[in-house]
Amino acid sequence: LFDRVLVIPEPFLAAMGLREEARLSDSGYVDPTRHSLIVDIGAGTTDMCLVQGYYPTPDDQVCYPVAGDAVDKTLADRIRRRWPDLVLSRVTVTQLKERYSCAGSARREAKVRLFADGKPRVIDIADMVRESCEMLVPVIADGIKALLKRCDSDSVVPILQNVILCGGGSAIQGLSEMVQQPLRSEGYEDATCRTPPDYRRLVAVGAVKIAENVRDDQWQIPM
């Protein structure tokens, strides 16, 4: 049991996890805790947060109930409509998505062996996986635009150049590049999205950093 807690938005923790303290004095280093927009794509929600050098307020955040689970459902529906006799569990769908996920110009061959009426059958689900994953693109782009409208004009360009995707959904190959496309086509010419190599552990690393440095009076004591 814990005798104290501190509730912090996951995207802010991700920014802390991405921050490289040893490089803060480098002239060309952009501190992700000062000018960034973090997109955390989880299972149930996609959480986005402006990180501008201070603890984010509710106005700095947006949350959409469209994420990994929604991609799974869409993929399962597409496969079942095309091959209604296939045996397809939720676990199998998730595994197929995680193995073959891609978006945009990133293409993957996805010929898989599934069972129909007790017999093995090889089907090609490449386009279905890609199209299902791409449902996240307009959601993320809309969230980014909504948050940019809340920024000071001086902050828009540096934040737009530092859009960071993390969470399990950011593993979708080609997703960060595809999110840039609708933004740039609508005039956000400086839009730059990226997925850090250690995207899966950023939140955990950030949580440890904060836990080690938080003051005693900042902890929340549960009743």
Region roles according to the model:
Residues A43-C49:
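Short glycine/serine/threonine-rich phosphate/pyrophosphate-binding segments
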Residues D142:
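Periplasmic peptidoglycan-binding/anchoring modules of Gram-negative envelope and division proteins
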